[in-house]
C-alpha cells in the first residue's frame, strides 16, 4: 500500500504542477476561437485544430506560409536537411531528406565552451559531405540565426543565404567543398 500511496501522491503532484498550473505556457493567452483546420496544411492533419504561439492572432497566415514552404520544398529534389520545430514536415513531404528532430542552442548541440563542440561541428560537416547535402532549410522564425549556423555560414563563404518567405530560409551549399 505504501508504494501505491507514493504513486498516487506523485501522479497528483505532477499533474497539478505540470498540467493544471502550467497550462502549456505558450498558449495560455491564445484565443482558441481563432483556430483553423490543420487539414489545410495536409490531409494527414485532418481532425486537428491549428494555432501556435508564433501566429496567435493569425493562424491562417501561418498556414499559408507553411503551405508555401511545403510547395517550395517539394520542388527541391536535391538532397537537403530541414531544421524546424514543425516536426510534421518529415511525414508530409514525399521526398527523402535528413533532419534532426529538434534543434536548440546549448541543448541539441554542445555550447561553444564545451569540449565536444568542435567534434560535433566536424561530425555535422562530415555528414553534409558524406550525404552530398546541397541545401539546408530552416522553417521557423530565426532558426538560421542560432550561433551554430551563424558560425557555419561565417566560416564557409560558399554558403548563399536566401529568404524564401517569412518562415523559410535556405542555405545553398552547392558550391561548398567540405
Q: What residue spans do the PLM features occupy?
A:
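Non-transmembrane, interaction-prone segments in cytosolic or luminal domains
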Residues: 7-15, 104-107, 120-123, 176
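Short, flexible coil/linker elements and helix-boundary hinge sites characteristic
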Residues: 74-75, 132, 157, 172
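Short periplasmic/luminal acceptor-recognition loop of GT-C membrane glycosyltransferases, typified by
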Residues: 20-21, 32-105, 134-143
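Conserved, well-structured beta-alpha core segment at the onset of a catalytic domain
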Residues: 1-9, 154, 158, 176
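Residues at the C-termini of beta-strands that transition into short coil/loop
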Residues: 2-5, 101-104, 164
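Core SAM-dependent methyltransferase catalytic element
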Residues: 168-178
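Signature aromatic-anchored transmembrane alpha helix within multi-pass, membrane-resident enzymes
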Residues: 1-26
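Periplasmic/luminal catalytic loop of GT-C fold multi-pass membrane glycosyltransferases
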Residues: 88-92, 108-166
Amino acid at each position: 500500500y505504501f508504494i501505491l500511496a507514493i504513486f498516487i501522491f506523485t501522479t497528483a503532484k505532477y499533474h497539478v504542477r505540470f498540467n493544471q498550473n502550467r497550462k502549456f505556457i505558450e498558449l495560455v493567452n491564445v484565443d482558441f476561437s481563432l483556430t483553423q483546420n490543420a487539414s489545410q496544411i495536409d490531409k494527414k492533419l485532418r481532425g486537428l485544430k491549428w494555432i501556435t504561439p508564433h501566429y496567435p492572432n493569425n493562424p491562417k497566415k501561418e498556414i499559408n506560409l507553411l503551405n508555401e514552404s511545403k510547395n517550395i520544398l517539394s520542388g527541391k529534389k536535391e538532397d537537403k536537411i530541414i531544421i524546424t520545430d514543425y516536426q510534421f514536415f518529415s511525414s508530409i513531404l514525399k521526398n527523402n531528406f535528413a533532419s534532426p528532430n529538434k534543434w536548440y542552442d546549448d541543448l541539441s548541440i554542445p555550447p561553444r565552451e564545451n569540449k565536444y563542440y568542435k567534434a560535433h561541428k566536424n561530425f555535422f560537416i562530415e555528414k553534409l559531405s558524406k550525404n552530398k547535402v546541397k541545401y539546408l532549410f530552416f522553417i521557423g522564425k530565426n532558426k538560421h540565426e542560432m550561433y551554430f549556423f551563424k558560425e557555419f555560414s561565417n566560416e564557409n563563404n560558399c554558403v548563399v543565404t536566401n529568404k524564401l518567405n517569412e518562415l523559410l530560409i535556405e542555405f545553398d551549399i552547392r558550391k561548398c567543398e567540405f
